[in-house]
């Protein structure tokens, strides 16, 4: 038994409430080390001689990463405080007990040697997420390039490669006019990158947080967009750029004008005067990524915190938006995010808060900051598996298992699974134009649990290299559209919505074969059992054990074969 691999903490990731009187307790162990894990629990305060409150629960393996297995027990309890410990039996028959961060050879009888779970505390800190969000489908729009309400010359609109200086006249009215496309695709949530006043096309260097950029439209246009989306059953998420501003933002302008005498000096991180931000040089004030045009805000300053929290609340009240995506969220303090969550949830309880972070985000996802994140670990694993072919299918599944094993159960169905975005090259570009690879990547994205985030144009196989070329004009003319890819996305989304088992069903089987480069995931709910088959090789593979069953993706009986870089959804 590998003692050093055993990990449990009485925190919001390994011991927490998911509902009134319903709790989750998890433990991490070495991969393939354990034959059985039993959770022992009892009431902390009721003496044994008065009442025997002991219970035992056989824990269930819920995820496997590259080096660890994760076990979980769910238990109903109605008491003041629970005491608990673990009984491990490894594959060699060795037995050990673990309580209060110590190992014991004998069963633990002293309650002071056990772990602690105070019920009220855990329930008061329970992770509450919007009821509407789990497993919904997101569509990301870059407003400057998605759709224009005015006529734009075709040569200008479809320019490739495109630069950050190209103006395609995209606007909110253009988005409104194309909502039917988004709805018909099967989208639940529309996420827009920033739309506030700025001189750039990307709008991440904001000048005025209370004004829609005139090139995009007006507050009334935004209000109409939200209303029209809501009529179609869609939610609207906007981009919150609170890590930094543009240089022309009033507070930084005041600093540039008045220097050390500016009353806004403490709104930023100024190292010395005069301010210097020569191209190619590191500015003498903190910025986003050393870009002098994006000075970093000091959100520890109560005035700054209040200003930007007020901005977030204002747009919720003014236009009834449904979520904020937090740009560069991991470079802003936990203190700010805790206060931010309380403020916006007080205005609209079912607001969705999404953080931008490119790695594991467990410390932001404990129920008191964000609801979810853009799942860049998913993106990176899709690149490694399909685009670069650097990992085998077993490692892909294990890497996703790390997230499932360590994240709160409430947020896992809300993870924004993406294969590209406005900050990356298009997936098709990373695959050197291999559409079959994007075809399979879309199947992974849309058939796994979470909130898949489709970047505008992926449904038409839009190409595009790294930023800014990944932000080309949307393919609205049929001559540019890949209709086969579009129908594939529609079919995947239709199946996902019609068969809740695909995204919400319990995973009861996972078969990965590295030599074949195939994955079979079997999910089950009260209505049906479904096998999701992914063939990551370039050659056809046989799955004769499912022959004759119905293949939802092809809408016909399964012939037992899955072509190279293809998928199947089989009703068992």
Locate the predicted segments by residue.
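The feature marks proteins involved in alpha-glucan
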Residues: 1-24, 49-138, 148-163, 167
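Substrate-binding/active-site clefts of carbohydrate-active enzymes
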Residues: 136, 142-188, 195-318, 340-346, ...
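Aromatic/acidic polysaccharide-binding cleft in carbohydrate-active enzymes
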Residues: 144, 366-368, 372, 413-435, ...
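C-terminal beta-strand-rich structural cap/linker in extracellular carbohydrate-active enzymes
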Residues: 31, 82, 558-572
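Hydrophobic faces of well-ordered beta-strands that scaffold small-molecule active sites
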Residues: 137-139, 190-192, 236-238, 324, ...
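Carbohydrate-binding surface patches
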Residues: 24-26, 510-546
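Active-site-proximal helices and loops of the catalytic beta/alpha 8
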Residues: 226-234, 249-259, 317, 327-410, ...
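Conserved, mostly hydrophobic/aromatic
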Residues: 27, 141, 182, 192, ...
């Amino acid at each position: 038994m590998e003692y050093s691999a055993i990990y449990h903490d009485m925190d919001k990731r390994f011991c927490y409430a998911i509902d009134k009187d319903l709790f989750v307790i998890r433990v991490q162990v070495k991969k393939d080390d354990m034959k059985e894990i039993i959770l022992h629990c009892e009431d902390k305060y009721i003496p044994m001689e008065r009442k025997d409150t002991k219970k035992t629960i056989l824990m269930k393996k819920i995820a496997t990463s590259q080096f660890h297995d994760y076990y979980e027990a769910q238990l109903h309890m109605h008491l003041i405080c629970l005491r608990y410990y673990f009984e491990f039996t490894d594959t060699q028959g060795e037995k050990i007990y673990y309580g209060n961060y110590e190992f014991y050879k004998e069963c633990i009888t002293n309650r002071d040697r056990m772990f602690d779970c105070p019920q009220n505390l855990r329930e008061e800190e329970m992770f509450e997420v919007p009821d509407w969000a789990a497993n919904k489908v997101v569509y990301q729009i870059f407003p400057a390039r998605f759709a224009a309400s005015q006529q734009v010359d075709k040569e200008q609109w479809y320019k490739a490669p495109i630069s950050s200086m190209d103006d395609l006249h995209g606007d909110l009215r253009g988005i409104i006019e194309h909502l039917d496309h988004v709805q018909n695709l099967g989208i639940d949530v529309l996420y827009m990158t920033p739309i506030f006043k700025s001189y750039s096309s990307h709008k991440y260097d904001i000048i005025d947080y209370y004004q829609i950029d005139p090139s995009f439209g007006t507050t009334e246009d935004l209000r109409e967009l939200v209303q029209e989306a809501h009529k179609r059953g869609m939610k609207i998420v906007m981009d919150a750029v609170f890590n930094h501003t543009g240089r022309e933002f009033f507070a930084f302008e005041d600093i540039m004008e008045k220097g050390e005498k500016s009353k806004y000096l403490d709104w930023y991180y100024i190292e010395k005067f005069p301010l210097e931000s020569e191209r190619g040089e590191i500015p003498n004030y903190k910025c986003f990524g050393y870009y002098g045009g994006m000075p970093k805000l000091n959100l520890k300053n109560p005035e700054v915190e209040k200003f930007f929290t007020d901005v977030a609340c204002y747009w919720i009240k003014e236009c009834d938006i449904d979520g904020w995506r937090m740009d560069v969220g991991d470079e802003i303090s936990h203190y700010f995010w805790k206060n931010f969550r309380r403020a916006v949830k007080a205005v609209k309880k079912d607001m969705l808060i999404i953080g931008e972070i490119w790695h594991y985000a467990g410390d932001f996802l404990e129920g008191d900051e964000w609801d979810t994140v853009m799942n860049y670990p998913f993106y990176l694993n899709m690149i490694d598996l399909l685009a670069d072919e650097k990992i085998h299918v077993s490692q892909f599944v294990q890497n996703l298992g790390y997230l499932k094993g360590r994240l709160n159960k409430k947020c896992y169905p809300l993870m924004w699974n993406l294969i590209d975005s406005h900050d990356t090259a298009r997936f098709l570009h990373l695959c050197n134009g291999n559409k079959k690879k994007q075809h399979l990547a879309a199947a992974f994205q849309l058939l796994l649990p979470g909130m898949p985030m489709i970047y505008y144009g992926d449904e038409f196989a839009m190409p595009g290299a790294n930023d800014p070329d990944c932000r080309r004009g949307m393919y609205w003319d049929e001559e540019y559209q890949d209709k086969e890819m579009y129908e594939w996305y529609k079919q995947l989304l239709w199946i996902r919505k019609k068969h809740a088992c695909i995204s919400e069903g319990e995973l009861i089987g996972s078969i990965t074969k590295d030599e074949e480069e195939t994955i079979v995931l079997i999910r089950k709910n009260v209505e049906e059992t479904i096998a999701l088959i992914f063939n990551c090789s370039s050659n056809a593979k046989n799955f004769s054990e499912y022959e004759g069953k119905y293949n939802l993706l092809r809408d016909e009986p399964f012939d037992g074969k899955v072509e190279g870089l293809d998928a199947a959804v089989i009703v068992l």
